[in-house]
Amino acid sequence: EKTNFEQMGLAPPITQTMTTYVLGDDLYDESFSIDTQAGEFMGEYGVGVSEAIGVGEPKKVTALEIWLFDKNDIKTATKVLMSQHAFNDPGIRARLEPKGELVLVEPQSQVLLETATLQLLATVVDLEYGRGPLPSDSYFERITLELAIWPRQG
């Protein structure tokens, strides 16, 4: 169920979507357009697989990347959502740091991305770790994110 931001005293977002990664969706890569009510293109946002661990099928995804592209900003904002294991692993951290700010994923946690004229609030709605021979809390069985976009105030 989508968050009613107006009940929280916030302006309604320009766009709001839910997306779920499930173990086995090796090609998970979602992107969405941001348009004004008049249909003017403002940018895009999305989420996709950033890093997997272990070997074999399906991929054991240990980190996802959330990004926000603003047509008025030369730089795309990116944050990397990491499993507990990945967040505490110096080798994985070193590989992923060039992609963007590293964030530990926790249920109900929120991550804010900002560009010149847009902001994206990502909320971890649901998080379930895979169980298996790999370290505990190392890869996602499923993760549901709510992504909401507003004009940036300022």
Residue ranges and their predicted role:
Residues E1-G154:
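Surface-exposed, beta-sheet-biased, low-hydrophobicity segments with strongly acidic/polar composition
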